[in-house]
């Protein structure tokens, strides 16, 4: 950004070049509520150009060996790590998350996504069988699909964008990606590194803009046979409808209403500290955050008291202050939506123990217009309430007692979502038993957010379609072909 410019102005990255866009969208600094960046408002014209560039690059890129592609991915990881602090500062300012979270989670994981898939693509095996009575040998081949359309969300901007780009290009596809228009800066910064990393023009194309314009043009494009999307269930329905006429491969990672089940024999100290983190990390703007907490009745009073005390020690404030645990929510509209659930809770007779409407948040004068909200704990909520049924996606969690194991499993499953769950107990038999019965794609016991990227990631029910990670990403971003050779 030049000194005479008021705003940072982003450009699309198409065919190895930065391309200005005549239409621009305001992007806000969540910590101040002020415009600080202009993002392309791309539409069909820009998406079409990106798809053409990706199609032209596909034959040569897909013909490269996995080892050659792996070297390019590792080089990009090196370049991101070399500029780690620049990416950290940009991600924090653009998204509102704390600089500590961006430094410890977002940017290191973004680089690691490239390293992980650079390695894993070298170690996949295919199937083979011999039919002696027919004199035939059968084997499978995995081939890249073509141009991959990738749409990533605003909560973990570079982290989830690279989670999609890395396996797509590692397996030989070319990419047209659309990050969220609210958090586009680190994707734009990554584009500045692609040529140096060794990506030929057109292998990775980034088109910025809104879902209704750029996103719709991408998912409905006849030359994009594959879509990977992370975001809301409502948007996923539209993507499914728009892509259906073209029979596209879809991977949809959607919302969650994730339960924590805390039995009386849980390690209470570890459980409380982890549940504070699982409920409120990144302002509660993680699809895996805990938003329903079921506590066995005999320890419910103790848990609730200690949980409220621990949550009040969780600091909310200016994202650039490394002592803060939470920063600002993504937008004014989202803040109002989340606060609306507190209004609903009070109208339904629930009790707010801490946070919104109970405690005061002191902010510097320049941040008064920012989108801040204290972590909020609510009790006395019915299972049928919107607070227990809908994804809030903010620093709000509900706590409720339970009596029996089968009862709490039934209540935990009684939502339309099925992304993740946590179970707290020292009884190994119980945690295995409960994990098997929970309708969730990921179940953590006595921990949260421990991830082996080799294992499948995704949800059940309205939390998504398909899985990604390790061999699941390899399978999604390739097509399998069976070959029979008679000898």
Swiss-Prot record:
Q: Which PANTHER family match?
A: 2-AMINOMUCONIC SEMIALDEHYDE DEHYDROGENASE (PTHR43720:SF2)
UniProt xrefs under InterPro entries: Ald_DH/histidinol_DH, Ald_DH_C, Ald_DH_CS_CYS, Ald_DH_CS_GLU, Ald_DH_N, Aldehyde_DH_dom
Q: What is this protein called?
A: 2-aminomuconic semialdehyde dehydrogenase
Q: EC annotation?
A: 1.2.1.32
- GO BP field: L-kynurenine catabolic process; liver development; retinoic acid metabolic process
Q: What family is this?
A: Belongs to the aldehyde dehydrogenase family.
Protein function: Catalyzes the NAD-dependent oxidation of 2-aminomuconic semialdehyde of the kynurenine metabolic pathway in L-tryptophan degradation.
Residues with site note (Transition state stabilizer): 155
Name its species.
Danio rerio (Zebrafish)
Per UniProt, subcellular location reads as: Cytoplasm
Q: Reaction(s) catalyzed by this protein?
A: 2-aminomuconate 6-semialdehyde + NAD(+) + H2O = (2Z,4E)-2-aminomuconate + NADH + 2 H(+)
The record's top EC class is oxidoreductase
Binding, NAD(+): 231-236
* Alphabetical list of CDD domains matching this protein: ALDH_F8_HMSADH (cd07093)
Oxidoreductase among keywords: yes
Pathway where it operates: Amino-acid degradation; L-kynurenine degradation
Which Gene3D superfamilies does this chain map to? Aldehyde Dehydrogenase, Chain A, domain 1 (3.40.605.10), Aldehyde Dehydrogenase, Chain A, domain 2 (3.40.309.10)
